[in-house]
Design a protein with these regions (language model features):
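Short secondary-structure boundary segments
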Residues: 180-181
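Glycine- and other small-residue-rich loops at beta-strand/loop junctions that grip anionic moieties
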Residues: 126, 150-153
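Internal active-site segments that recognize and position negatively charged phosphoryl groups
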Residues: 163
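Active-site histidine-anchored catalytic micro-motif
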Residues: 160
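Conserved "HGTGT" condensation-loop signature of ketosynthase/thiolase-family condensing enzymes
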Residues: 1-146, 185, 191-236
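Hydrophobic pocket-lining residues that define ligand/cofactor binding sites across diverse proteins
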Residues: 167-168
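Short conserved active-site loop signatures built around small residues
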Residues: 157
């Protein structure tokens, strides 16, 4: 059995959409890279965010950056919804990789709770459940096959692809929408800071990297905000 990638969408610091991402990559340009202060006490860091505005979400308990990215992907690439029409809702699964989904929003709510002494009205604990992004995408597409999130830190999205292929190989699904979606949060930033894994100049492939992080060239995978790739993996 052979699986093939039939469609995909990406949004990152390089831009929104496949064409813009490729064009900026070729030019060596990343419009979403900015120096930010406040996440880590006493220092600023270079960080990659998706440039531009993201679609709004009316549902209070679903309104977080990772879900807005998923909505952007579905609105930008109709081929994902077409998988459900082609194979039937019961034969389309969803497997996403995510680690920090909803954490940034939760941090803001907790700060407000501590400051005011009252739980914020918009705060919903389901926002930090790891399964939330996959369930939200299920609602957007109307898929009724297996739906879950893989959360194994930086390897999450890669493992999601493997899980998607196994669902197809086992005959459980004819198509799976898979990939990775995540957002920035202080929790993750301070974790990488504690490991000494953040480069002051944010040049992961430069020969001028500080010695203690030369062996961690892939570290920026962990510090790139809202890196997202949606792929429809279909059975031939």
């Amino acid at each position: 059995m052979t699986c093939s990638v039939t469609s995909f969408f990406t949004a990152s610091a390089l831009g929104v959409g496949n064409a813009e991402t490729l064009a900026n990559y070729r030019l060596g340009r990343a419009p979403g890279m900015k120096e930010l202060a406040g996440d880590i006490p006493g220092r600023s860091i270079w960080f990659g965010s998706v440039p531009g505005e993201l679609p709004e979400i009316a549902e209070r308990d679903q309104d977080m950056r990772s879900n807005r990215l998923l909505k952007l992907a579905v609105e930008s690439e109709p081929a994902f919804a077409a998988l459900v029409a082609k194979y039937g809702a019961d034969r389309v699964g969803i497997v996403l990789g995510a680690s920090n989904t909803g954490i940034d929003e939760a941090e803001g709510f907790v700060d407000a709770w501590i400051e005011t002494g009252a739980k914020p009205e918009k705060m919903d604990f389901s926002m930090i459940e790891l399964g939330t992004p996959a369930l939200y995408l299920k609602g957007l597409l109307g898929a009724k096959g297996p739906v879950y999130t893989v959360s194994t830190a930086c390897s999450s999205a890669t493992k999601a692809f493997g899980a998607a292929r196994r669902l197809i190989a086992a005959g459980i699904c004819d198509a799976v929408v898979t990939g990775g979606v995540d957002g920035r949060c202080r929790f993750a930033m301070n974790g990488f800071q504690a490991l000494g894994a953040l480069s002051p100049g944010s040049k992961p492939t430069s020969r001028r990297l500080l010695r203690h992080i030369q062996s961690q060239a892939q570290t920026p995978v962990g510090i790139q905000d809202v890196s997202l790739s949606r792929h429809g993996v279909a059975r031939r």
